[in-house]
Amino acid sequence: MKKILIVDDQVEVRELVQVTLEIGDYQIFSAENGRQAVDVARAEHPDIILMDIMMPGSEVDGLEACRRLKSDPATADITIVMLSAKGQESDIMAGREAGANDYFTKPFSPIALIEKVEQVIGEN
């Protein structure tokens, strides 16, 4: 069974993404901040991580979590897709520079998200 990690500080967003992906045969994990994301990714090694960039109040935001995961040989191969309300070119570039493989701006199309997940899962 393929594994997906959803990372967002807002429980509503995590639940929305999970409901969107329930059509597939996936094992879904969630984390509410970057530190938890790194811990879960190291323990479970998901096939894809869907991660928010901004997580106010968190010691580790999505960009820093992405950097940590991509610099760790044990997790560097995990595909990371950023999900963010920040959609400026500079935000997208910051995500790419941190190591993100793709970037979706919120609100995102559920169909596009499903297609991206299926593409990544199919490649792994």
Stretch-by-stretch model annotation:
Residues 44-50, 55:
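Active-site beta3 strand of CheY-like receiver
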Residues 11-29:
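Two-component/phosphorelay signaling modules centered on CheY-like receiver
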Residues 18, 60-64, 87-102, 115:
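Alpha4 helix (beta4-alpha4-beta5 surface) of REC/receiver domains from two-component response regulators
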Residues 108-117:
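C-terminal output helix
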Residues 45-47, 73-79:
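His-Asp phosphorelay/catalytic-motif detector in bacterial-type signaling
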Residues 39, 61-76:
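Short amphipathic alpha-helix used as the core "switch/output" element in two-component signaling
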Residues 72, 86-87:
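Short, conserved "switch-loop" micro-motifs in signal-transduction and mechanochemical regulators
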